């Protein structure tokens, strides 16, 4: 992960081709499992669907994959990489300097994409397991009962989410080959069934797509687009996974994937033309086109593909949340790094949330047909938000004519707007579940972003230069015991010599902390994903060190590891005196002990604040109670840490007036004096 050079990033290799199969195309590659089924049901079933509807629906699928996936994402969006990283948050970091309001589409798009992460595993695994009904022995035993399907699906999801904590590097090695077999299977079976009726190839003509939308034979009307959109739901994931495989591998592998997917849809359409008008009950064209001898193999392969698609989405959700945390759009959560692969991470809270949400969706909706009614709504929102951000990027970063930018924005806002309108009807048929989930995530993002702004608004700063003399006297004062050799404060606000006043309150007022060196460290998250740099300002002393760490939004914020390097560099350059330790298991140790002090600002005198600001800050305090501690987030769990609570000093809060009550005896006594 993390291509370091443009040459390797744009280069395509055989290994990269196979890896892309497993990482990038899982979601879009499992769409043939349920897209045609949803379209057939929307047209009244197999016995009522018309030839125009079949050809038109196939045409809509082909051109949706072409315009949205190929043109927008593969040709255009992949060029909008942030140091080889893609996705809605990476795109946001490229354009946020141009307008503050761009945070809004970024948050909406991110929240919608995360909510979709709960629905995709549920619908893909359920669709695959429902293929068991095509096996005679299974059908004879359970018939159309949905309970066995639900139980098997829940078991697979449980195993899938439970193994996340162990890392997926070993399993990931087989993802690519399995998905290559899956796409080959789609292409071959689709081609074989295509021989049954080559007339479906006329769907390549976009006339049939437009004709269906306007045709009275289309029983679903414009809402047929809600089912058609299922064919391209994985396009956004394709962009998000850019950093995992590189642009070159996606450019080379997508034509193969697209051909195989379209052949599968063509084969299903040909079978539908041959069997339309028949009363076969609720059937899934994907499994119906296969001979009985291949059913068991296809169910197993489809289940593996569904698991891989789910795994890719789960891993993508971990990455998305970690980016949002570092961009200060979500609270800090515990992040583990279970694998040896760079960038592989595991977030227990997100994993548990996705597992519970996916399991609830399976139990609540029962069948994939009902889940499909809710599927796609969130992704249309994410795609619209990506279009807005991408338009700003094209206007500012690319040497393209303004007319192209206008055409791009107009065309895709119109196309995706139609899909959104068609999918909006899903709200009443289950889409509200995803909308509620997305709204909750967006609420937390909005609270976190706004509270961060308010924090800087109310936090007071002081100039370190005004307190250097006091700090120097304190470190030499024999009446105080040495608190620690090095005292380190992590601060969210430091501009040159100006720092958070609460830190000086902690050093000088709360309990004078005598130390040889005072460290003030601020972590600055850069727009580049893999930055690892620092700046040091010692304010003309050898006992005050102001450190600005510049870390990319993909980098771990493990302060002690970076600090060890900085201390060594400062001592080797002579800027910091060596701290010889007489007692140590390390011979000749030159670095003393460290104590990290974390300050927790608590809101005081909240009644003096505007009601909305008070609500935001108080809500943040409640959310922080269930999130990861700063000590764990900054990699301090093996260090000596002190957590102090200090008041959030508000600039507009006045002291409360109070008058002394004087008794008559005291009043007479005072008068006599």
Swiss-Prot record:
Presence of keyword Magnesium: no
Alphabetized UniProt keyword annotations: Cell membrane, Ion transport, Membrane, Potassium, Potassium transport, Symport, Transmembrane, Transmembrane helix, Transport
Membrane spanning stretches: 14-34, 58-78, 101-121, 147-167, 175-195, 196-216, 220-240, 252-272, 294-314, 345-365, 374-394, 403-423, 427-447
Keyword Transport tagged: yes
Cell compartments where the protein resides: Cell membrane
Role summary: Transport of potassium into the cell. Likely operates as a K(+):H(+) symporter.
Protein name: Putative potassium transport system protein Kup 1
Protein source organism: Lactococcus lactis subsp. cremoris (strain MG1363)
Pfam families named among the record's database cross-references: K_trans, K_trans_C
Reactions accelerated catalytically: K(+)(in) + H(+)(in) = K(+)(out) + H(+)(out)
One Gene Ontology cellular component annotation held by this UniProt entry: plasma membrane
GO MF assignments: potassium ion transmembrane transporter activity; symporter activity
Gene behind this protein: kup1
Principal location: membrane
UniProt family annotation: Belongs to the HAK/KUP transporter (TC 2.A.72) family.
Membrane topology: Multi-pass membrane protein
């Amino acid at each position: 992960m993390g291509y370091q050079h443009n040459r390797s990033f744009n280069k395509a290799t055989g290994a990269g081709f196979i890896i892309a199969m497993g990482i990038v195309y899982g979601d879009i590659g499992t769409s043939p499992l349920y897209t045609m089924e949803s379209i057939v049901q929307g047209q009244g079933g197999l016995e009522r669907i018309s030839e125009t509807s079949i050809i038109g629906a196939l045409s809509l699928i082909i051109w949706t994959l072409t315009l949205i996936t190929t043109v927008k994402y593969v040709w255009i969006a992949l060029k909008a990489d942030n140091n080889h990283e893609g996705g809605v948050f990476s795109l946001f970091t490229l354009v946020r300097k141009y307008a503050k309001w761009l945070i809004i589409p970024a948050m909406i798009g991110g929240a919608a994409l995360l909510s979709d992460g709960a629905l995709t595993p549920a619908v893909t695994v359920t669709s695959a397991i429902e293929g068991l009904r095509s096996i005679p022995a299974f059908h004879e035993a359970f018939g159309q009962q949905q309970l066995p399907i639900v139980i098997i699906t829940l078991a697979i999801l449980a195993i899938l989410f439970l193994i996340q904590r162990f890392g997926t590097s070993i399993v990931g090695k087989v993802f690519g080959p399995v998905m290559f077999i899956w796409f080959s299977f789609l292409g071959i079976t689709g081609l074989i069934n295509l021989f049954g009726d080559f007339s479906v190839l006329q769907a390549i003509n976009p006339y049939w797509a437009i004709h269906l939308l306007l045709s009275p034979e289309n029983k679903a009307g414009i809402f047929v687009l809600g089912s058609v959109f299922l064919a391209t739901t994985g396009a956004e994931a394709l962009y998000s996974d850019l950093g995992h495989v590189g642009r070159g591998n996606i450019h080379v592998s997508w034509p193969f994937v697209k051909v195989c997917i379209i052949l599968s849809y063509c084969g299903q359409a040909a079978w539908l033309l041959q069997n339309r008008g028949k009363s076969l009950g609720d059937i899934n064209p994907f499994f119906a086109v296969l001979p009985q001898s291949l059913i068991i193999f296809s169910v197993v392969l489809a289940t593996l593909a569904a698991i891989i698609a789910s795994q890719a989405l789960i891993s993508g959700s971990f990455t998305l949340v970690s980016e949002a945390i570092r961009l200060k759009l979500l609270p800090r959560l515990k992040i583990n790094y279970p694998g040896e692969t760079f960038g592989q991470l595991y977030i227990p809270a997100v994993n548990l949330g996705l597992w519970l949400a996916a399991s609830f969706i399976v139990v609540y909706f029962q069948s994939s047909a009902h889940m499909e009614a809710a599927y796609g709504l969130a992704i249309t929102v994410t795609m619209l938000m990506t279009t807005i951000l991408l338009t700003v990027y094209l206007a500012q970063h690319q040497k393209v004519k303004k007319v192209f930018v206008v055409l791009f924005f107009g065309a895709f806002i119109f196309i995706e707007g139609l899909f959104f309108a068609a999918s909006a009807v899903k709200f009443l048929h289950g889409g509200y579940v995803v909308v509620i989930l997305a709204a909750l995530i967006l609420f937390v993002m909005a609270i976190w972003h706004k509270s961060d702004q308010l924090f800087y608004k109310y936090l007071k700063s002081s100039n370190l230069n005004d307190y250097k003399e006091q700090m120097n006297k304190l470190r030499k004062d024999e009446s105080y015991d040495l608190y620690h050799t090095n005292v380190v404060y992590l601060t969210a606000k430091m501009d040159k010599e100006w720092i958070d006043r609460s830190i000086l309150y902690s050093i000088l007022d709360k309990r004078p902390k005598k130390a040889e060196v005072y460290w003030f460290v601020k972590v600055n998250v850069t727009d580049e994903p893999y930055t690892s740099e620092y700046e040091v300002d010692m304010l003309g002393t050898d006992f005050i060190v102001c450190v600005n760490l510049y870390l990319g939004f993909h980098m771990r914020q493990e302060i002690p590891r970076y600090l060890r390097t900085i201390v060594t560099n400062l001592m080797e350059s002579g800027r910091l005196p060596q701290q010889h330790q007489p007692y140590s298991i390390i011979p000749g140790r030159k670095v003393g002990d460290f104590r990290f002090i974390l300050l927790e600002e608590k809101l005081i005198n909240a009644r003096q604040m505007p009601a909305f600001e008070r609500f935001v800050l108080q809500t943040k305090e409640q959310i922080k109670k269930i999130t990861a501690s700063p000590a764990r987030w900054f990699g301090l769990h093996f260090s000596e840490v002190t957590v102090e609570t200090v008041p959030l000093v508000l600039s507009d809060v006045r002291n409360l007036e109070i008058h002394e009550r004087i008794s008559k005896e005291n009043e007479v006594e005072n008068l006599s004096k």
